[in-house]
Structure formats: C-alpha cells, structure tokens
Amino acid sequence: MDPNTWSADLFQLASQWQEKGLLTRYNVFMAISITVTALYLIHKGISRARSFRAPLVGRRFSWEPKWLIGLRFSQYGLEHLMEGCKRFNDGIFKVARNDTDILVIPNRYVDELHSKPEEHISAIKAHMKNLLGKYSTIDILQEGNLHTHVLQTKLTPNLGSLMSTIEEELRFAMTEEIPSTHEDWKDVSIYDIILHLVARISARVFVGQPTCRNQEWLDTSIRFTEHAFLTLAILRRLPKFLHPIVAPLLPSYWAVHRDLQTAKRIISPIVKQRTADEASGEPGYKKPTDLLQWMIDVASPRDGQPDKLAHRQLVLSLAAIHTTTMAVAYAIYDLCQFPEYVEPLRQEITDSLEQDGKWAKTTLTKMHKLDSFIKESQRLSPPSLLSFQRIVMQEVTLSDGTALPKGTHISVPAAEVLQGKAFDSSFDGFRYSRRRQNSGEAHKYQFATTDKNSLHFGHGKYACPGRFFAAYEIKMIISHLLMDYDFRFPPGTSRPKVFSADEVLLPDPSTRVLMHRRTDSAHSNCH
C-alpha cells in the first residue's frame, strides 16, 4: 500500500470518528500525531530497503537527522555536491533532498545508460518526481508521448519556415514590452522584459494568432510556472508522505489548478473550432501552422480531447518559457560584465544578415561566436547542477559490476565545476567557436549538442526535444537586443549572484540593468 493513501484514509477515518463522538479533539490530535510518526517510520524503512548503499554528503554530525541534511541541501545544494565530487572523485555518492535521496554517479556511465529503454530506467518518472507531477499537474505527460513526438517530428523540422514568424512576433513583443529609451539610459528589470518576450514568442509558435496576443493566456502561461515551482519548492522540503497533507494548505497549489482551468477555458474552444473548420471543407480554409494544430492532427482520440490539449499546452509553456528566459538573462548579464564581446558579436550578426538578406535559420546557424557565447554563459551559469535524472525501474548492472537497485533515483553532475576535471572559472566567450574550427568538431561544441560532458539538455533518447527551437529562439532574441540596444549595470553593481534551490540554480529576478536604444541602431538591417 502507498503511505500517501494511508495518510488520507486515516485522516478521513479520524474525522468520521470525531463526528460520531468516538474521539475527543485531544484524541484526534494524538491519533494524527501517531499516524504521522508511524507513516514516517514506514516511509523511512521502505526508502532504506530500496536504497543503494553509498556515502551521504552534507552531514555535519554523525547523529544529525537526515531531514536536517535535506533542509540544508535546499539552500546549499552546490556546496553539498562539490563536497561529494571532491571527496569521491569520479565515484558514487548520495545527496539528500527531503523528498528523496539522489544517487550521484559519474558521467562515465552516461554512454552505457542513455540507450536503455524506459522500462529499465525512466526519465519521465524522474521528471514526475522532481516536478511533483501530481501536485503541479504535469502528470498529464505520463499519458503519452504526444508532446515529444510533435516537437521532434513537426516543430524541429519546420524551424526554417517558422523563422520569419518568430522574428515578426519578437519585433511586436519588443515594441510592447520594452519601455522607450530614446532619450537616455533607463533602469529596467531586464529579467521581466525577457520573460515576456519569450512568453510571446513561445505563444506564437505554440498556439498561433490571435491567441498569442491574448493577455490572459500570456499571463496564465507565465504564472503557471511560478505557482507550480513555488508549490514544489515548499513540498520538496518535506518528507514525501506529508505532501498530500500539506499541498491542499498551500495557496500556490490552488493557483496551479486555477491556471489550468483558465487554460482549458481559453484553448479548448479553439481546438473545437479548428476541428469544425477543417471538417467543414470550406474552399477558403487554411490550416494553421503551430504546435497546437500539429497536436490536433496527430493526437489519438483520447489525447486529442480539447481539455487535454489545453493542459499539454500549459505544461509545455512551463518547459519552454523560464529556462529560455534564464539563458537570455545570463547572456545579457555577461555582456554587461564583459562588454569587449559586444562589437565582435554585432559584427558577426551584421555579416550573417548581409549574406542572407533576411532573418532565416541559416542566418542564425552562421553565428558561431554568438552560439559560443551563449554556451559559455551556460557553462558558468547552468540551469541545474544535476542532469540525466532517471528512476531505476528494474535492477540495472553496470559494466563495472555496480548494481543499481529498483527504485534508485540516479543523476549525473551537469555543471562543469562538478565533473572532476580542471575547471576554468574565467569567462571565455569564444571558447567554443575556436574549438569548432578544428576538423570534425564543427557540431560537437554547438549550444544544442548533447554528450556525456554537455548534459544541460539531457542526453540520449530523452534529451530535451525542444532544445533546437530554444537555441534558435535564444539567438534570435539576443541578436535583436544587441543590434538595437546598449546595456550596462548601474553604477556600483555587477553581475548578480545566482540562487540555489536544491540542485536548481536561479538568477535574481530583481536585477536591474541600464538600457539605451542605440542611435545607430541596426533595426533597418534586421529585416
């Protein structure tokens, strides 16, 4: 039986007994206390029975309870992981999150694990566990691979034809979201500006016009992620068996469900109308070219239900908006910190545009220096310290004889500082463009390329299916911002510190940047 189910049943039973006069309030409190304690011990026993025996890092005293170690990991995840990588160089160790133990394995195992089927080690189960799918509502992704299939077979192959659409929406978004800076430098929240640019572009590609300019949809797609992550940030600090008890007490939990209802109210009628329009056979019918339409086209009758498609659209917004926003924000911070890169990048953008005469996929592909700059920015400011997270579904024996028991949550260090090699902490924006000049390595060092040493998008069959769209979107946004604006930090400030929440790294969203429209703006050359 599932301890989570036990807790709900026992609490309901206690309430019924109280209503019948069988328990006083004191006895109810005692019954609940005993239940919680018993469930904790059961949960701990089950976890221990399934656990891979490995040293646990982050413990300060031998008698220290694990929940305290897990609580510290939520704030000092980088320190715990660095301790483990230093003490057990190229070895295996554990870190404690309060909702689970994570077994950290060296990246040398990636090549033999990435091809194993989902029935052996599951990426989707790890995503559900990390993002608390039951409480964030992303568990709909377990119902099928519709989103992955459409991203891989429809979005990525059509990126070339979508470039003019993306550029058009970006231009519109910049006029809507960036305040007028013609006269002087303006102090702005650059993260917030980028967030709304990304949300608008993503909406144009995902749901098309006119919905992409529906302010309620844009707000919902942004807030959903914020509400979901606030919910999981709180629940992750608690043992798993407490999640069904605490979640309904959180305002953010209910906000997630309100966001979902809003998404269904906006998107479901569009799905029904599109289906009816296509079925009508009208001569003037023109099928939309966006992710929603591709989902309608290939979905099974079950997956194609309007409410389910609306739900998937909202979850895809969660995946697309904030990680892309962070990548662009970090790159802008690095341009402020290292302004010597600005002019070489502008020259590359200008040269690429002159060769193609317009914004095209090939235009962005030519920008090796910009691609390198973004990759270097990500190297020093990764979105997560861990990647390649999997749940072992049946015991797996590695090539060196290491046996991973069923139920083990495994991961690999993604941040280069954790990968057991000499770490260069200096910023070298063109590091990867130089490496791409070597024979046979033109593709190896691209921003969207994955391998055992570059895991920010995952690796293998379950690498991020939208990473190519993200890479082109990031380059498109940075190119336009660079050509039209100058940036610098306000006097007395510098690149903001990064916050740690478990293994996730987050920029300070309150960071201010001075922004000024260039008098010699290349706006006219950007078409």
UniProtKB/Swiss-Prot annotation:
The UniProt record gives the binding positions of heme as 464
Report the EC code(s) recorded for this entry. Answer: 1.-.-.-
Q: What does the record note as the disruption phenotype of the gene behind this chain?
A: Abolishes the production of 15-deoxyoxalicine B and accumulates decaturin D and decaturin G.
Question: What SUPFAM superfamilies does the annotation carry?
Answer: Cytochrome P450
Enumerate the subcellular locations listed in this protein's record, separating them with semicolons: Membrane
Main location as per UniProt: membrane
User: What family, per the record?
Assistant: Belongs to the cytochrome P450 family.
User: Function of this protein?
Assistant: Cytochrome P450 monooxygenase; part of the gene cluster that mediates the biosynthesis of 15-deoxyoxalicine B. The first step of the pathway is the synthesis of nicotinyl-CoA from nicotinic acid by the nicotinic acid-CoA ligase olcI. Nicotinyl-CoA is then a substrate of polyketide synthase olcA to produce 4-hydroxy-6-(3-pyridinyl)-2H-pyran-2-one (HPPO) which is further prenylated by the polyprenyl transferase olcH to yield geranylgeranyl-HPPO. Geranylgeranyl pyrophosphate is provided by the cluster-specific geranylgeranyl pyrophosphate synthase olcC.
Q: Quote the protein name from its UniProt record.
A: Cytochrome P450 monooxygenase olcJ
Where on the tree of life does the source sit, at the highest rank? Eukaryota
Asked whether the UniProt record includes Iron among its keywords, one would answer yes
Locate the transmembrane regions by residue number.
21-43
